[in-house]
């Protein structure tokens, strides 16, 4: 009874729960009848919400004893005499008088039917009006369904008549005339009999009502029928049973029966914290619900479309939708997804990544005349390249690429190579994009040439590549090109370069859309470097065909055609090599001309420069104008003064107690939980990610436990590493045949170095590792994801933020934790084998 009394007490004129809280009668005296009634209504609503909050939080008793109906009937009560209804005579039953038909009400007119409110069947559907039997299975609920909110159930709110509401609003417009207007507009209200003037005998409540509450009635409904959906049929069932319990079992009065049964009904459908923990388990929190994240359509429309782009709609458009599968497990804040394969995305990608730098038609920088002629590359060691045979080319590939290039080589035997084979086929890259960091970036496009052209071009580029990387590397004391080195070798190289300077500082160079800014002059300079080592007229012809690119892009619902001069085609065989040649030689020329002693490390368009701090200002003043003169927009990143804070290819060096190695950013945890392959390949993909990652990150805080979790919950790896999308992960070069999976113990040195690198304290590191070590397999609707089909996976528009994302926030560098003193300078002449022996 306390449940309803706490709500109804506010109607009593003199009731006040605490000193200083005005009663209803005092509110009438101070604010008038209208405002007093609204205040009372608000107080009653808050009291009702408090009861529902107590149900949600488990703060109310739900095990109050409910006497059985039979026991209640045995109690001495004055039984009411009920007259037996008269039965019709046989003659009446056999009569055929149909006069009752005429007495039936007439059916509604057409106008009435058209103006009526929709029925429940029309609103909810007939299927929702059925009573759902209790199945005993757990109902999966999302975190957003059960988080506390100001109003946790839809409690009915009484409202005053419109005329009274308008009068109250009028007082707000003219505060000074509030009381006068209320007096002028006061209606003659009908007299209502209050109290008990006729001495009507009132109902007496049964003894159980002294302790009974709505929460106990709601739990009784749960015990009888389970936790059901709030369909109209289930509402009718629950309300009827609750009224029977209160009337026949507890001896409740009419008022108590109605109000308490209504409140108990809301609680029956309202989930509690215990429901979340028991019914839904740990879904959407730690176990990792698997979601199908919808592909993304760019919302940015080009304000200026390049006149070179010709757009054509497909005659028979196909579905453009792509889906990425995300494991919503404990991890940093991220929302990884993939762009749809649509004409809309393709047009923006080509427009902003080939012709313009934004959607407003801003052209990329053009190099100054003769700018590349000043770059000296005479220091490169001379060597001669022996071309491969075409059979060597296709045999160097695996999987589907091997089949494709074998077919291309066979076709070259029947039809010679022509300029038309140099045409470019463009498509939207199925790239994992963090849409929380970049809400609407321009989609990236891949622009490969025909396999026939690539097969012939590979005859020269494949043997040239490793030799030219080595020649570039020997421009410095330690290698300046990271290609060919694994994570440990790269970490040792960075550490040794750092140790060469008394007061080192590292500056990262980030070229904005590097491929787009590779002009014809930049291509001619790069090809001039190639020709120093490859002497072939066929090779020269292939290089000339790359200056003007005729491209055709395809999406599921349309096509584009365009022609562009220059630009690095992202699918070209020499994309990585050409970018390394440009960045190393351009940056080296700048620093040499400034007279700054330095060390360089490059991987494509990702470049870092290490120097003494005294030269930093001179370098910063010169770097942007220098690259602008060459046609590049260069962003100079913030300098770092601690070895562990050096950013290179989304990794940072960490010392594990024995050696330095490059460790991926902590955001890789979220990225590894996203995949864009087929659902059936998801277990194999997770297993491959874990196995490849642990080969490099064994013994590294957080990563060690997370990657072993992926291996534990994945499936058989199979041939997933031959998948075309595997290259996008970038783990192959990161590993390079290394296996440190046997290193399972995380050293104290590793924890301190990891804290300096990523700002996660050793205490938080251990807490995260304990969570990953205890996690089971990801789920779909409460079932192991390996046992369900893709149709069972819930599709969402974006990954929801979680309250545990802040566990991974960088809390700042801890200089005391840096392990820079453990750098071994090594030998003057660097060789990879010698470096590995030192590790």
Swiss-Prot record:
This is RNA-directed RNA polymerase. The keyword Zinc-finger does not apply. It comes from Groundnut rosette virus (strain MC1) (GRV). Disulfide bonds: none annotated. It catalyses: RNA(n) + a ribonucleoside 5'-triphosphate = RNA(n+1) + diphosphate. One of its GO terms (biological process) is viral RNA genome replication. GO terms for molecular function: nucleotide binding; RNA binding; RNA-directed RNA polymerase activity. The keyword Transferase applies. Keywords: Nucleotide-binding, Nucleotidyltransferase, RNA-directed RNA polymerase, Transferase, Viral RNA replication. Residues 504-619 form the RdRp catalytic domain. RNA-dependent RNA polymerase replicates the viral genome. It holds the Pfam family RdRP_3. Its EC number is 2.7.7.48.
